[in-house]
């Protein structure tokens, strides 16, 4: 009978008690000795029954040697019980809730039935149990006291009598607790509290605490330090009397008490970390021991941190052998090749099994041995199952079928290539090895265009390379990890590779129409020479004579015709910025390729550059596959580099020099900037700078200076006038996108301008009021604050050089500080999302719990998308009718078609206009990413047709329309199967929505007016191609989309954090660049957010176009507290006299006059009789009141309404210039009365508290709105003619702070268009679906143009909101989403705490996802391992054919 095969479905965690230890133990430790002579001592802590790590003796239990023996635990019977150190808090909870006399619960268990199981005991223990009477035995429950000096000691205070609770007493108490009580308090029967006090502890196997002995007998030996701890425990245990009986309240001998305390501490050190040798550590009562100069090791210390067992061995990947070296570039290598030094190739070995078909190939390796390359190092003999060194073989040794030969690495082997950090899956790619025969080479070499996969460069980067050993692993590596699979980025849906730097410039120079010497032409021999290194089929030059001149476009077309495509786009070379200063050839301002022929234009970054979405290589990959695209990149690169080598290209200092006239013009521009800066300085000195609300004068001054010192766009004019764009190498590199930018060119040639650190000018931190030693204190000139007038080519002065270095130093420190935070954020994201896997229905689920009904809401793989334009979206009703309505045949079908097109347009507009209204910066556009470019398919079909333009008839037109209509109707069946399509079963709504965008595009591109010249056969071929590409674009089953989303978001987020410079309190470098991303992913509540904003549209259309009215509304909603309107205030202790009308303080004697006027003008506001002796005198800020349109009357009325226990007097509002507005607030005696009605009129604390309340009083505005400013918006609207109109004169209010509910109550605000950046505020008011959308929009807003495909953002949002609440990506969020996945949470962080909690709760962990199966030693069900393979072994055996029989058949 054959043995069955099963997988572990789940793991349960429990607390191990005495019985568990005894059942698992193979022997009992009785002595502390290690060895007796040459063998382990029987009954000692190195007993051979617990395993072996020595080759001199076998394990007695399993009879295996040290390599095969896994080890077996033993037990130590304790003479007195010990507390389980991991569960001290649990022991304390049980002692608080059960009777110490009878073990019955002393709390009402029914009160906690509504709580979830894990929270019941903790909630019961937090209640007041001291002094309660037991329901059963009527004994009063004492107070449980934790010893502050000893972590493991508990005391009971019984009516003043304090007794010590020894572990033996606690064990007796717990033994009386019933299982029914345990279950009702939320614990499992396996977690009975009696297990928390141990009489038998487990001794770990020898295999996890190995020893080393050199020789036999008295030779040198070294043992694991944990053995010393076990020895201490055994020795202390022997000092305790065997039959020790402890009765509660009875005193025991002092030496026994100390031994009990010591053995408890030793057991703690044995299990958990020991951190100190002091008697107590930090007041926690935890003592520690050391071994030599380091803390004693512990069992649990092996689990956490990067070097722990979980991350290092169980989750971390390991290989037999690996090589590492510095990388350098080699353009002679293909993108999927890697140059490997021969010294490495002779060291790294590849195991290959000898077979009939390869024995002749392997024989040279065998004969060469170690003497000559390629050779081998050793042979595994199958018959004897032994390994032989190749140099020690006998003459009669023969290589036979079945042997394994460990040969050298040779050209053609596949290898993994990796650069750390591995933030994306493309960071590990499989390349073909090319062995470099030159022995002086010791670096890895790779094509420059291949660096994009690894984010590598050649400034000293090092990479790893290792070769898979088995045939299976080599095949899997080539199929699953080949770099061709990473050509299209999962993150951006665009191509990763392309031409860079030299080859980009070469492509431009080769394809431009004219050169400085005339037309860009070459002879036949030169053109043929360009193809020498392309490693493609050489084009035919037979039709050209040696005297014929070929232009660059023709030469490139010969290459492109091998993979014919159609392409049209404006090149990077043409720019509106340069157009006024240079002459463009009309044939170079638009690049057009038709059926593989370059008709016009040039090839630069937009066409052939790395990462160019929609470029030439992207189109080739979509039509011919990524492998063909990589070949074309290499061929184009070789063509461009060969041309550059022949034609020449360089950047010299002559390219960077300005003419005297241009230099003079640049100096004039710089002088204008300096004069404007000086004018701002004069305004500051004369006090003419008036900052807006929310900014100090200094901050506003710095902002004015930064704006004034920016180089204007016209500084490009003298640069462009002094160079020749046709010959200037620096300009050509910038203009073609090969390297550099306009600011780089300005810095090199004209001037560097203002240096900014943390978005600020250089601050005076050298000393008080001084930036550098070169400038005097309080200098105001722009040069003293980091403005550099000189350019790099002109040279920098000493202070200018230092300013530049300060900026570089800031970037270095900022990167160093951010690396740890971004790395941990990436790791949290990986663990938080790794359980999200696509199932057979293309749903995303965590085990059986649904996350997305359909991945990305459309089921598409982000790598299978391309950008297309929807023609109808921007058209008006009349334009749509003129362009798309077919009137050649009178039929209701075409009315239906046009009506459908119009509905599609309106539906598209409605969806994306809603998105535009509820996002800060996402405008509607007619460009979208779809899986099929229908227009391209139609064009390719027409170009490949040889029949020309055919006449069309009414029948074929109707038939084509019917074909398209039926196809669009059945398109959602692509998500299901052909059987359901034939049966026409109902389609779920979410599948119809998933295909809606694609159906809109198909109806546009295959409208009747656009397909008149297409035959029915061609239409059928077009529809078949659309269906094929659409099916191939669907996400694969078993795809780990959670990890893909985490990688795609974390990598650009890391770059965002490094680029974000925020100001810290000290004005230096800090980590606040990660504040906003942390707020989003940590799901922080509203009150904890630091950067929340709101965008408020105005309800009245007339008002939202008037900036003045909009500012008035912004002022009215901005929260104005009384404190913001005050210049200074004083708390005075004085006696108010209504008759004398005088004041006590001489400094304020002038107040008498206006106080007298106030009483005369306000006869109804006379002072009350109970005025206390406390007065608050305040001076108001008139400027702030004017800017915020707040009157004195509104301030006083608001204060009187909110503080009735005061008497308020004030001066007049229209005071003369320089005379402040004064308010005096007298406190009444009722404000000082307490519950005892005792007068406290002299209580200063109460007066100060009242002052705080007054200052924080709200005068006007919405709570939470710290600041409100008017901003200009750009939005779209549909006019009466159905045309989409862009409005750029709309004003809205942008606030600092959020309060959606408060804003909705304002009559001037449109409640339907309120946008808040706060996820918490959105969740509270609109619900979980709105919060989901807000997470998506906020991540996109944070990342901007560098953001990933929206499918990855959907993955984040759906996971964070799956439970109905917004959960974070932190440990707490993972606990809420996957509470049962203990192994995953343990792998993320705090494994000891997670395991402890799981054991207390008796958690059952189903094995799913990635981390849990990996930790259990099985293969996760993802990717190709998601589906099971069923194999008929009987059929294979019956139909097996030997090599001889196959040869005979041949």
Curated annotation (Swiss-Prot):
A biological-process GO annotation: viral transcription
Subcellular location, principal: virion
Keyword annotations from UniProtKB, A to Z: DNA-directed RNA polymerase, Nucleotidyltransferase, Transcription, Transferase, Viral transcription, Virion
Cellular component, GO annotation: DNA-directed RNA polymerase complex; virion component
Reaction equation(s) it catalyzes: RNA(n) + a ribonucleoside 5'-triphosphate = RNA(n+1) + diphosphate
A Pfam family of this chain: RNA_pol_Rpb1_5
Gene Ontology MF term list: DNA binding; DNA-directed RNA polymerase activity
EC code(s) of this entry: 2.7.7.6
Localisation per UniProt entry: Virion
Induction pattern: Expressed in the late phase of the viral replicative cycle.
Similarity-based family: Belongs to the RNA polymerase beta' chain family.
Domain notes: Lacks the typical C-terminal domain (CTD).
Subunit structure, as described in the record: Part of the viral DNA-directed RNA polymerase that consists of 8 polII-like subunits (RPB1, RPB2, RPB3, RPB5, RPB6, RPB7, RPB9, RPB10), a capping enzyme and a termination factor.
Protein name according to UniProt: DNA-directed RNA polymerase RPB1 homolog
Organism encoding this protein: African swine fever virus (isolate Pig/Kenya/KEN-50/1950) (ASFV)
Lineage: Viruses, Varidnaviria, Bamfordvirae, Nucleocytoviricota, Pokkesviricetes
